[in-house]
Amino acid sequence: MNTHTPPLRIALICDWFRPRVGGIEIHLQGLAEGLTRAGHEPHVITATPGPATDYPFPVHRLAVPVTERFGFVYTPAPFIQIQALLRRLAFDVVHCHSSILSPLTYGSLYLAKRLGLPAVMTCHSVLKYYWGLFLVADRLWGWSRWPVLFSAVSPTAAAFLEKAGRMAAVHILPNAVHSDRWRLPEVQKDPDEILLVSVMRLSIRKRGHTLIRLLPELLRQCPPNRRLHLTIVGDGTQKPRLERLVCRLGLQGVVDLPGVLDQTVIAALFARSDIFVLPANQEAFGVAALEARSAGLPVVGMGRSALSHFIRHGVEGLLAADDGELGKHLLSLIHDDESRRHIARHNRTTATEWTWESAISRHLELYAQARQERDRFNGQRLCRIRGNEP
């Protein structure tokens, strides 16, 4: 039980949750588990269909239709159900989690405001090409002036959210990991084989096709006595396209697309792999890269993404300015065993600061601020009402 904060009942609202797999779903599960361990009562509210009994916290799956491809709600029904839940369960805080387009989350944030509930919103995406649309919406509806604490999962994501509205501040509520779940005992590796691994949602923005297209050149420049293999874990709308690309490039047997894997299976895959690579250049955080770094893998990714907040070039991994440099960094680690092992040794023996223990403390601080903000807003509204009395 958390002795510093009275137990809170917290609504964690998101368009998506498990069994769908991605950074936002993994984050939501980790947050709910961490809050439960700290003695609080989180409730996940989502439109994603699935079981409600597989978790140590309540999961409310709304009985509403969603689009097949992206899982978006498109009727008023979910908001009627959410309003009833918010009223019946008397939440202390409502914490909404958004991507770029999150109709359930945005509508729920409005409901929390209308019901006078303390509210926090966390943005899990980089609004690089979309912040202007949010700014127009703010001019129309003034969402950034609501009594809500706005946050993002990294400074990279926060910078674009700040441009999208007129809020006083955007707080940072980062992703996190349980390091001990990823740091498995070292396994004996084949010195003649280099195993590359990536974990991502197979969407266009994640750029799995870019990674696969690098493989022919990597194979051409690979030492003659060394075999190369790439595993891309994940599922999504681009999987058929990636499978066709693998066949067209003749990479069957070199590239494996196993789909969604359980985290324990991914941890075992990390333990026997040599390099983790994440080609996305608009990554809001990159929790899979943090998990791989915690497992002891050198991480290769794009320097313009949020990886730069927890991967230092030459220390935890290598960061590229463009796709050509991404390929060069991979080749350097494929050829240079000592550099690769040096980074891996650092990652295995140096704990990351991005743990759920510290993240939960930060969340609780922001929840307390949200309750204060709600009280301040209500006090100002009461003063205005009294000022208008005859």
Question: How would you name each of these model-derived features?
Answer:
Residues 281:
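Aromatic "clamp/platform" in nucleotide-sugar-dependent glycosyltransferases that forms part
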Residues 241-261:
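Nucleotide-activated donor-binding/catalytic signature segment of Leloir-type glycosyltransferases, i.e.
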